[in-house]
């Protein structure tokens, strides 16, 4: 049983992250370490519950935790008020109060919604993230962003609310289909592009081990991704400045998700395309070379990620991006890569021409 530990340092709201293979049974140990409440709601979807619900229930029960499952539908299209109401209803029906806790067991949708329910129920109850997808393990479970979608845009209703603990068992990644695994790799690759060229190169060197989901390779990749995100969150918890770089590829990616009705593309797939568009914009602004754009494209394609934007009009893309929550006073704030391993946030006054030129590259 391999276990790596790290801490997200946020003063009184600091919390540990455990990363390993076969560590699911050690969740009660982690709960005790952070003095988690004994009465727990486990928010999950039917598929994840069928895979891991019994193991979790056995571990909690054997350690004296009173637990209740609240089942919610999976999928980005269900990350809405109706599903949030289902969680509230379950908490109220089971008599939960401020001295109870919540575990979000599942992927990013479950983590975002479980976290937002915890942030808002009785003005806040403690929660723990147990992410079971690669995307959730390296992105949404770390940093305290919680949210639901609005018909006009993604994650428009949310709160910053840090978990007490994040419990990452990479063995859960063996159950993912190839497409779901790839969508998580998009976010892993993002960290290399924006902050760590050596990690970017490591991902390419270890591509075969990652593709076959070797436990050691997965632990190393997830740990480094979490370290990079934690270091950024520690400096800028609420995205006043530095944390915005985590949105590399996301402005255009969210536009793709919105225009496709959250149906055609998974989040990481949309972000992969968004990163390619951002890289071409960066190239147009002489922030990176054509070879570096090619290296980004090559690594994304290694993991079978899409790199070509869908055929929506430039006007549709611009309108969707203007609804992005990162727009300030009508100006787009784009994260652009400076080569590989560094980036900057750039306000774009006239995005139409820049994006028109970038889209011509596809």
From Swiss-Prot:
Gene3D superfamilies: 3.40.50.1970, Dehydroquinate synthase-like - alpha domain
Required cofactor(s): Co(2+); Zn(2+); NAD(+)
Coiled-coil stretches: none
Cofactor note as given: Binds 1 divalent metal cation per subunit. Can use either Co(2+) or Zn(2+).
GO biological process, one term: chorismate biosynthetic process
Single Gene Ontology MF annotation: nucleotide binding
Enzyme category, top tier: lyase
Subcellular location: Cytoplasm
Family recorded in the similarity comment: Belongs to the sugar phosphate cyclases superfamily. Dehydroquinate synthase family.
NCBIfam families: aroB (TIGR01357)
Purpose: Catalyzes the conversion of 3-deoxy-D-arabino-heptulosonate 7-phosphate (DAHP) to dehydroquinate (DHQ).
Name this polypeptide is given: 3-dehydroquinate synthase
Species of origin: Syntrophotalea carbinolica (strain DSM 2380 / NBRC 103641 / GraBd1)
